[in-house]
Design a protein with these regions (language model features):
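Positively charged, Gly/Ser-enriched RNA/tRNA-binding surfaces
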Residues: 1-50, 99-303
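Acidic, His- and aromatic-enriched active-site or binding-groove loops in soluble protein domains
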Residues: 72-95
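Short, hinge-like loop/turn segments at secondary-structure boundaries
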Residues: 71-73, 288-289
């Protein structure tokens, strides 16, 4: 976890400084990393009671194969993908208009967009591109993507769906393989994403290191939780033990044992020495979420 900065126009859930929660697997070249990362991240979201969200998945090599098949030069890929990334905002017609405005051949643009009209958001869509793109797409790319989708769907513990999305770009050009994003209707966009970046670490260390990562936007998740009045499990069971400062040590041990047992049962227990202004002390604890109070005096225990 750490702070991240970017030049952006602040808006709901989008800030110039934000906290990013990241999980990465280094040294694993196979799709086991992608499967594990997706399952770990979605399990976390499930425990926070998020449901019916979507993991959109694609592969940078599919993006490149679609562009090459359509007749775009490799030097044009970045520009083409930047425009494609706007698909959810400007639609197919908007993408076509911008590609033509960039001066690309109409035949190439038409052939490119026909792929998106015919592909479906499931394993059948992956198979369609595998068959259509032929030699432009290495066979293992499509097979690996299908395996990721199948494996996650078969072993997931949270309530979400996997969707193949050939328009998913993930703006970072350092991605080398599968890429994915978390889409939530209640946010209206992505609350997290990641992918494989096998070449990045080696550029800095000189040592080739396969890598894959997944991150969630901490502020976006917190914002959504607050908007639906999410309560931390056990937060209603916050109890304060307020102890007379003259409490004998033998009786203090009994209180500590009682607190230990309560904590083992899932309660949050705060042990504090009683202050002169007890009302003010309790009021302060109430602001911290404590709803139950037990007061202990020297004569609270017999014997």
């Amino acid at each position: 976890m750490g702070n991240v900065w970017r030049a952006d126009r602040p808006q709901r859930g989008r800030y110039r400084q934000f906290m990013q929660c990241d999980i990465d697997i280094l040294g694993e070249p196979t799709i086991l990393a992608e499967i594990e990362l997706i399952l770990a991240t979605t399990t976390l979201l499930g425990k926070l009671d998020f449901k019916n969200f979507t993991i959109r998945i694609n592969d940078r090599r599919i993006l490149k194969a679609m562009a090459a098949y359509s007749g775009f030069a490799e030097a044009d890929y970045d520009t083409v993908f930047i425009i494609l990334d706007k698909m959810d905002k400007i639609g197919l017609d908007g993408v076509k208009e911008e590609l033509l405005k960039e001066g690309y051949a109409e035949d190439a643009v038409t052939k490119y967009l026909e792929l998106f009209e015919k592909v479906t958001a499931d394993i059948s869509g992956v198979q369609y591109l595998k068959e259509t793109l032929g030699a432009f797409l290495p066979e293992e790319v499509a097979e690996n993507l299908k395996t990721i989708i199948d494996s996650v769907e078969s072993t997931k513990s949270a309530d979400f769906k996997m969707a193949f999305d050939p328009t998913l770009v993930r703006g970072m050009s350092y991605y080398t393989g599968p890429i994915f994003e978390i889409s939530m209707d209640e946010y209206g966009g992505s609350v997290g994403g990641g992918g494989r970046y096998d070449e990045m670490i080696g550029k800095f260390t000189g040592q080739p290191t396969p890598a894959c990562g997944f991150s969630i936007g901490f502020e976006r998740i917190i914002m959504l939780l607050l908007e639906r009045d999410f309560e931390i499990p056990g937060s209603k069971n916050k109890t304060a033990y307020i102890i007379d400062k003259k409490m004998p040590s033998d009786k203090l041990l009994k209180i500590l044992e009682q607190a230990k047992q309560a904590r083992a049962e899932g309660q949050i227990v705060n042990i504090a020495i009683m202050k002169k202004n007890k009302k003010f002390q309790k009021d302060q604890m109430i602001t911290e979420g404590y709803t139950q109070f037990e007061e202990f005096y020297a004569d609270s225990f017999e014997g």
